Amino acid sequence: MDLLDAWDYFINEVRKFFKEKGYTEVSTPLLLDFPNLDSNVEPVKVEVLERGENKVKWLHTSPEYSMKKLLSRYKRDIFQITKVFRNNEWGRLHRIEFHMLEWYAVGCDYLYLIEELKQLLNKLFGFKEFEVITVEEAFKRHFGEGIPQEESSMKELLERKGIDFSEDEDWETLFYRAFIEVERHLGFNRPTFLINFPERLCALAKVRNGYAERFELFIKGIELANGWTEETNPEEVRKRLEREAKKRNLPLDEDFIKAHEDMPECAGCSLGIDRLFSLFLGKEELVSEFFRA
């Protein structure tokens, strides 16, 4: 099987998995009037000529906003395989342009999506055993202590472990400096699901009992998927997005917030298809001859 045959087989198996589970495949715009407000992700800004006027548009960093607008209207399980774009990303596992699988399950939570992902990984790789641990447990395993709750104590941890940081960095930035050291050790004996993120890292996940109902999937130290139980309260969504928009000086999509007025309870997940395909081929870096321009 050559590279093109392998891709054709792989992508059809992924698509068949969701079709057989009753998901509806959708297609949404790549070019948006407003950027995704994903923390730590830089959107690609473009200028276009529309109806004779120069306008600023944004290439989506994920299809989340458009898919949730569909969810609020149709209230059914949906999935999409699409190209997404993230500025200033290049490396062994990063490209500015890459394929993303995203799906939403109505009436379900993040634990349901974890079970679905287990089934997909079993179908593609034959995996039968999985590990599910909390972020707190992962920190204790790697650093010998739990997650520091203050900036000062997080800096002390980083200093003790010889991890570089800047004095002016906030808690979230400091956390991810430590988290990089944790994640590179995950998923070597079996795929690892890291669950229950600190509330401060909730993104648009529902928060219960002091933590975000959110997970990430790792295989061989590579992050493959990120999912959560969706926060459906429009006022809570507005509060979080306004905070992020102000911090990054980016415009806010009011229609996206309004869509949450009719949003069903659901859970959503995004998965890096190019990374998963590379692992499917037995590679631990992106198959560059297939994904480069």
Swiss-Prot record:
PANTHER family in the cross-refs: ELONGATION FACTOR P--(R)-BETA-LYSINE LIGASE, LYSYL-TRNA SYNTHETASE
Annotated ATP binding sites: 86-88, 223-224, 272
Residues annotated as transmembrane: none
Biological processes annotated in GO: lysyl-tRNA aminoacylation
Gene responsible for this protein: genX
Superkingdom as given in the UniProt entry: Bacteria
UniProt subunit comment: Homodimer.
PROSITE patterns, alphabetized: AA_TRNA_LIGASE_II (PS50862)
GO molecular function: ATP binding; lysine-tRNA ligase activity; tRNA binding
Name of protein: Elongation factor P--(R)-beta-lysine ligase homolog
GO cellular component: cytoplasm
InterPro entries reported in the protein's UniProt record: Aa-tRNA-synt_II (IPR004364), aa-tRNA-synth_II (IPR006195), aa-tRNA-synth_II/BPL/LPL (IPR045864), EpmA (IPR004525)
Pfam hit, one: tRNA-synt_2
Alphabetically ordered keywords of this record: ATP-binding, Ligase, Nucleotide-binding
Protein family according to the UniProt entry: Belongs to the class-II aminoacyl-tRNA synthetase family. EpmA subfamily.
